[in-house]
Each structure stands twice: as structure tokens, then as C-alpha cells.
Amino acid sequence: MRKVFSGIIVASVVMFFLAGSWTSAQAAPITVRTVSAWSKSAQFETQQFLELLDMIQKEANQKYPGQLVFDYKGAGEVIPTQQQVEALRSGLVDMVLTAASYYTSIMPEMDVMSLTTMTPWEERKAGVDAYLEKLHNAKANAHYLARMGSGDLFHIFLSKPVQKIDDFKGMKIRVSPTHIPFMKDLGVEPVVTPPSEIYTAMERSVVVGYVQPVASIRTMGLLPVTKYMVRPGFYQPIVLVLMNLDFWKKLPDNLKKLLTEGMEKGEHMEMDKIAEKIKFELGEFKKAGVSTIELPPADAKKFTKMADDALMGVVLKKSPEDGKKLYELITKK
């Protein structure tokens, strides 16, 4: 009985995603089944992404009526966050908005992108996109569409203060996989949980802090359990839009052009909005009583070097050639 029930559940999930999917035998519209790593109610990047899809949809309706439809299925409640790129690779979904750190099991070199100091269009000009396209084609059966979420940095947020770098030793802090090596070097005990569980972990003192970008704290509802933000920040949150490669290849040229140009516009829009967003959010932090802790200059310098060295050390062990090449490409000459 249990096996029958499990089979029904699996079949239901598959049918949920196959509903409205596009095959070569079907007529238009082509339906793009889409998921995101974060919910639209909690994450700034998801909200901006869905606004962008709406903009592209309107342009498609005007230029190519009846040819393209975006079907947003949801976030981690539909497919667990760290399984979404695997779902994309297999063709269960057609497009994902995700973070590079969520699929390093497939592509460990993607962590290098957290060290970029370029804008997405500078990366395109420098050959970064072309190299990422090659890697995603080969390793994830994916087409690299765009990089969103630029300009923000990760920070450590705490419920109790620190004064120097040694004070982090022994702390339990919620992190994403990318942050684990650095946190361990700081003496932190890293805890990995889904983003939706950070509030509960803080409220119940399972952790005394978490690592997140500035723009997402308030919308995730974390201000009530947050007292301190530590500077300097480290690593850019690398938010990407990927499409299943087989799906991409089947698209007619007019829709490929529409999507490519629309996503490039979205990159510029995101950069403009994130600067305003960060300024606004820092003001909201003050209103909520969140204090900023600036590490002493010597500690701050050590902190930044430890962060960069920890990340590159791991990447070069797992993917020496691609990791080194990617780092060279994102480093401004």
C-alpha cells in the first residue's frame, strides 16, 4: 500500500510539471515551466524576476501573439531549492532562477563567481558568459541566460555582538554551502538550513546568526530576530537564470532573441534597483534597532582575505582548470 501511495505522489508531481509542457508535436503557445529558489513573497530577486517575466510576456504578446507563455510553478515548496538545477537538467522544468551556490555539486567552479567585481555586461564583454555557457552546456544540460542579483554582498547577521574576528569562534551560524569553508576557518560551526527556516532557527536559538545579503533580510521577516550586522561584507550573491538546453535548442529564433534581449535588459534594471534597495534597507535596519559592527581595520583585512582564500582553496581542489580559468576571466585587467 505504501509503495502504491508513493507512486501516486511521484506521478502527481511529474504530471504537475508536464501539464502545459511543450513538445515538437504541439502547436503554439510554447509554455516555459519555471521555478525559483526563493518564494516571490520573501525574496527581492524573485520579485524582480517575475516582474521581468511579465515585461517579456507583454512584449511577446505584442510581437508574437500566442507563441509564448511563462508558467511560474513556485519555489522550494514545489522542488527543493538545491534540487532545482538537477530538475532543469532532466527536463522536469524549463527555466530556473537560482543561486550559483545551490548547484556546486554539479559545477563546483561556480563558487568563483562570488568574487566577481564586474557587472553582467562587463562579464559578457570579457568572455565570461561564453565560458559559462560552455560549462553549463556540458555539465548541467543548461543554457546560461543571465546573471541577476548583482551589487549586493553577504553579511553576517547576529543576535549577540562581536568586537573582533576571534569572537566568532564557537558560534553556530546558518550559512549556504558556499560559505562553509570560510565559516570553518573563522571557527564558526556552520548550520545549513533552507532559507524559510532561518527565522525559526534564530528564534529558538538553534543558531545565533545567519549569512544573507542585505536586500533580503526585511522581506524574509528576519528583522525581529536580528540585532547586529557585521562589516565588511563578502562574496556577491550570484543569482542566475538558466534554461534547459534541449528546450532552448527547440525554440524558434525569434523567441530566443526575445528572451536574450529581455534578460539583458533585466540585468541593467536589477543593477539600478539593487543600489536603491540596499540604501532603503539599511535605513529600515536602523529603524528596527539593528546595529552595525565594523571590525577593526586589521581584522577586516584579515576577514576579507580569509573569505577569498577559503573559497578559492575549495574550488581549485574540486575543479582546478575551470576554477582557475573562470577566476582569470572575472578579474579586471
Predicted stretch roles:
Residues K125-A138:
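Signature of the catalytic double-stranded beta-helix
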Residues I9, G20-S21, L251:
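Prokaryotic Sec-type signal peptides and long signal-anchor helices
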Residues M1-A11:
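Bacterial N-terminal signal peptides that target proteins for export
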Residues A27-M118, E122, N137-A138, A142-K333:
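N-terminal secretory/targeting leader peptides
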Residues M15-A25:
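C-terminal segment of classical bacterial N-terminal signal peptides
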Residues S12-V13, Q43:
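Alpha-helical transmembrane segments and their juxtamembrane interfaces
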